[in-house]
Amino acid sequence: MDNRIAYKVKKTNCKTGTKNLLKEMFREEKDQAKYDNGVRDLHPEMTQHNVWLEKPNIETFDKERDERIKEINKKRAERTSEEYTAYDRRKLRSDTVDMLSQVVQPSSEWINNHTREEAVALLTEAYNMMKEHPELYGEVKAAVIHLDESSPHLQVLSSALDMENLRSKAKELVGNKTAMSEKQTIFANGLKERGFDVERGVNRLSHNYKARKEYLENKYQTPITRHNEQKY
């Protein structure tokens, strides 16, 4: 059985509002036309069953983000000790990444072999794990399980700001391709330790994967991507 679980993350800088993203998280049955792009396969009759694990205030969310940035800038300016340089005292960049948008999604085969209740249990535990480890996933500020699409998934918004050290830790939380690949392994292993039968997705950075990809592309004279690799 294909029991892979996907973990994806995108960065959002402090100049970008999250209201539209939050509206999507808060979507209702009547909103289908706004979010159904022909690919997502929305089931609006199921929207009422979406599960909120951490529900934010959509009207104050971005204001609270701004306040955290202002608090950091104020405290940085107040650094008077000689150990701090002018760089340490200056404001955060205007395009500082302060939020992470994260999605957790089991494979279609895993979903087809488990009940909706089991899917909710898995995704709820994924949320709990992320909540317990802000050093890996940021400080969770919003989380919802979408059951109104063809494949149930968890959507999480978390803060990437380090309020103690007065900086953004987005680079450490996301990292480069290699670090992200390692994090996907850590994520899947964390859920396995909690009793769930899941594996990380395909490791496209591994030597074995690259060698097999090259072999298949030469054999079939076609590019192998994550969208078609299961056919070969």
Enumerate the predicted regions with their spans.
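N-terminal nicking endonuclease/strand-transfer module with a His-rich metal-binding environment
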Residues: 1-232
